[in-house]
């Protein structure tokens, strides 16, 4: 095999692994657009945009990855859906996960609403194999926000429900309004 063929085969192999590997994190300089996904390390869960049932609206959610029928376990913007496929998820300068419509990047549709001063490499969002979306400080590894503290309609192993007397946080499940409206 000559050098050119070896180079071509090696390049194709590298490209295959580069594009077939999924990412489970985003940082302050990255975005997730409608059509992009975060995939947990062991492929148990996916985070991305979806339209439930016959709805024309788009939601940011987490669902089981290894189940044939999409089974959503968490929804970020259930009260404020996005019209069309214009959703963008990012981390803002304050360390919040922020969901915008591409048509209006100034007004967030949904946010984690935490108050952490972020720097370029400080805050990371990661989708864990438990289905928990965690926002953490990359330096101290301390959790800033997690989806398990804000459940929607599904209880997953590791979640806690009820009142946390120390923090005052009350966690509870709320059913979907219909198959097309989470």
What spans do the regions from the language model cover?
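Beta-rich ligand-binding surfaces for carbohydrates and other polyanions
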Residues: 2-182
């Amino acid at each position: 095999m000559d050098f050119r063929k070896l180079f071509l085969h090696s390049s194709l192999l590298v490209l295959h692994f580069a594009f077939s590997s999924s990412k489970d994190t985003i940082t302050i300089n990255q975005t997730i657009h409608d059509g992009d996904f975060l995939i947990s390390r062991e492929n148990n869960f996916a985070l991305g945009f979806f339209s439930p049932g016959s709805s024309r609206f788009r939601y940011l959610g987490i669902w089981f990855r290894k189940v044939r029928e999409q089974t959503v376990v968490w929804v970020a913007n259930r009260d404020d859906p996005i019209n069309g496929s214009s959703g963008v998820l990012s981390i803002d300068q304050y360390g919040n996960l922020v969901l915008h419509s591409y048509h209006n990047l100034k007004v967030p549709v949904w946010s984690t609403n935490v108050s952490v001063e972020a720097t370029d490499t400080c805050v990371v969002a990661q989708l864990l194999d438990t289905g928990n979306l965690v926002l953490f400080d990359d330096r101290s590894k301390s959790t800033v926000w997690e989806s398990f503290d804000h459940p929607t309609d599904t209880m997953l192993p590791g979640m806690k429900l009820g009142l946390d007397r120390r923090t005052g946080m009350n966690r509870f499940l709320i059913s979907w309004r219909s198959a097309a409206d989470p």
